[in-house]
Amino acid sequence: MNKPVLVSFLVSGDPNPDATLKFMKTLDKYSGVIELGIPFSDPVADGPTIQAADVRALSNGFKIAKSFEVLKEFRKESNTPVILMTYYNPVYKRGIENFVISAKEAGANGLVIVDLPLQEATEYREICKKHEMGTVFLAAPNTPEDRLKTSDEASTEFLYLISTFGITGARESFEQMTFDFIKRARTTCKGKICVGFGISKGSHAESLIEQGADGVIVGSAFVDIIKNYGDSEEALVKLEELAKELSEGIEKGYEKRK
């Protein structure tokens, strides 16, 4: 991940596992990383768009093993890094080591457990290190300097910068606070920093990359397309159009930085 990249997020099993695989292959053309969300019944960090996607997947009988199967299929055709996003409860229920081994065998490059604070993640980090599984932690605009530094050090893939306070979901534009946060993280962090929450168009990607981000994480905007078009050819066309627009925005932002 040398040039800035698009990190594309999808909810696994929304609306069904076969569709997820098709969506992953479509987004792969423009994505440097794919983030695959494991549906959960109480996704506290997610806004209504992703919550609704979780409900759609779960109501269709989604099981975690299906995420691993989809990823195994994807791995037959692509080496693009895949990060699995989940909450702590499903990991704990399966057993941390069991979950990490299953994810590794399926072809995952890293994990982000949204509601697992760094100070409670010692065992999890040790298990990930043992099985060569990457880790991603989160930081918010109000994260103090020392925590930002330790979160960066604990994140082997990239540090996930939350662009603003609150939950996921598309928004119109970004405040100066977000740009200041990226600059602060750029100064403090030695690893890669990717920005998520609220990014839905090329101009967003351009402005965030221009400020120094290594990647933009886009979820709700893709999930909205899936909500509206379901498992259809039109969904694939719309997903590719948006991914292309975001990718071009990233390129423009990177050019402005030079």
UniProtKB/Swiss-Prot annotation:
EC number, as in UniProt: 4.2.1.20
Complex and partners: Tetramer of two alpha and two beta chains.
Family classification: Belongs to the TrpA family.
Top-rank EC class of the record's enzyme: lyase
Recorded metabolic or biological pathway in which this protein acts: Amino-acid biosynthesis; L-tryptophan biosynthesis; L-tryptophan from chorismate: step 5/5
Keyword Lyase tagged: yes
Organism in which the protein naturally occurs: Methanococcus maripaludis (strain C6 / ATCC BAA-1332)
Annotated protein name in UniProt: Tryptophan synthase alpha chain
